[in-house]
Amino acid sequence: MAAVAISAIASPVTAQPPPPAREQLTIGITQFPSTLHPNIESMVAKSYTLGFTHLPLTAYGPDWTLQCLGCDTLPSLENGQAVRETTPDGKPGLRVTWRLREGLRWGDGTPVTAEDLRFAWEAGRAFETGFGGAEFYRSAYEFLSDDPRSVTLRFDKVTFDYASAGNFVPLPARLERPRWEADKRGYRSRTGYDTESANPGLWSGPYRVAGVQPGASIALERNPGWTGPAPAFQRIIIRAVENTAALEAQLLAGQVDMVAGELGLPLDQAIALERRTGSRFRFEYKPGLVWEHIDLNLDNPVLADVRVRQALLLGMDRGRIVQSLYGGRQPVAATGIHPDDPMSDPEVRRWPFDPARAQALLEEAGWKPGEGGIRRNAAGERLSFEFMTTAGNRAREQVQQVIQGMWRAIGVEARIRNEPPRVLFAETLSQRRFTGGALFAWVSSPENVPRSTLHSSEIPTAERNWSGQNYPGFRNAEMDALIEALPEELDPAKRRPLWARLQAITAEQLPALPLWHRADAHVWPQWLDGVRPTGHLNFSSLWVTEWKVR
């Protein structure tokens, strides 16, 4: 600020032309969403896009505290919008009420009402629909509404995060209910969010989807039904460039104005770009609740043996990878719980790089040194499995190759086969078609109970229409019990030992191999202000009305 003031005094006093009007902002990201439906599949590209176009009831803000976005007041026991009660079968339950924000409308001018949330609740309760967050809908056993702006859910248990509506968001009942009622199981492929994406009646945020070029870009325009603060740009283009080198080239050529850190350049690439470009762009490095890891398919007999999983982790020098590729800016992970999370256990087991111990575990598991340096079991089978990640992400592919070499040094063959993100997430992972390991990231929120990724009921199956994100197929009765008990304990001090035990199980059993907690690199033009990275699963796009042109 001082440097700016000095420069102004030293310069001749002349009339300055107004800054050029900027009607369009072009944003580069590295994935294209496989669907735009708010409740189907879990993908960062979709969540980032929906931040501009679909207003949730609640979200965690940049300060990691819960906020009302589509509601007017957060429910609490103190204000009476949350009430303890007894369920019809005699269990402790909770009645929670949200009131919709006044003036909330869909893009065609139709008010958002309780009926839109009733439809979302009914579709979520019909598990053949395949919505994510199945436990939320199972627990919410009754929907009540006294008026068009009032929504009450009765839950069959008490939970500490009751004020958060999570992914329980309005869906335009007049448009989507007929499609759903015609074919509940086939609804995910018939929804207007993917077949008529430009219908303004689907969108309730500051922007609406105006056009989609599948696999390439999504055009957003100001939503005429939006009654909140006006966003700065008439039009936003979200451009998907899966190859990060190509994305950087488009940024330098001015074909994109900014790269969203939520899904943008890897840290090492951004650091190198900042060194080369000086002050041309603004860079912000935001540490957050983003967990890079390798999911392992535990139905694979090789990976079903916990000794093999432990050996794989011992055989990776994660500290060296972080230091050489990321300048030490990303903390090595012990579990999926970030060290800054209030429930992180500093005493959780850690697996240092120890190739000798890794080889001893493989010997113990029956894998002996074999021809070509790859271990074999008594039946002569090679210790070999497929290793996947998102094609085009240069940093992930580089990490993958480094890990492949480290594993080969202990006698393990990892066969690399990568896929574009929209295929990997929409089909291979969500339908558990991967057979070995898959390197990707999960994004969470503060004190997020990992039900969808670790509870045995969340293993995706055809019968569940592939809902759930327990891609490894992890089954552990104690883990299930902890995940069910944790949300019901309102006292943080009493939750702490439950969290510690949950972390101990994941660190010992290793359904996924923890790598590091990621810092995201946000790259903005100098003329853009107001973007506030959050570091968690409610992305900066939710606060687009705060973005301004300097």
Regions found by a protein language model. Name each.
Residues 17, 29, 213-217, 222-224, ...:
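Detector for C-terminal structural segments
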Residues 28-88, 200-204:
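N-terminal lobe/hinge region of extracytoplasmic solute-binding protein
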Residues 74-130, 152, 247-250, 302-304:
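Aromatic- and charge-enriched surface segment that lines or borders ligand/interaction sites
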Residues 26-29, 113-120, 150-154, 205-206, ...:
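Alpha-helical secondary-structure segments
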Residues 109-111, 116, 245-256, 272, ...:
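Short helices/loops that flank or line small-molecule/ion binding pockets
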Residues 59-65, 169-231, 235, 245, ...:
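Gly/Pro-rich hinge or "lid" segments in bacterial periplasmic/extracellular proteins
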Residues 124, 142-144, 210-224, 237-300, ...:
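Extracellular/periplasmic solute-recognition and catalytic clefts
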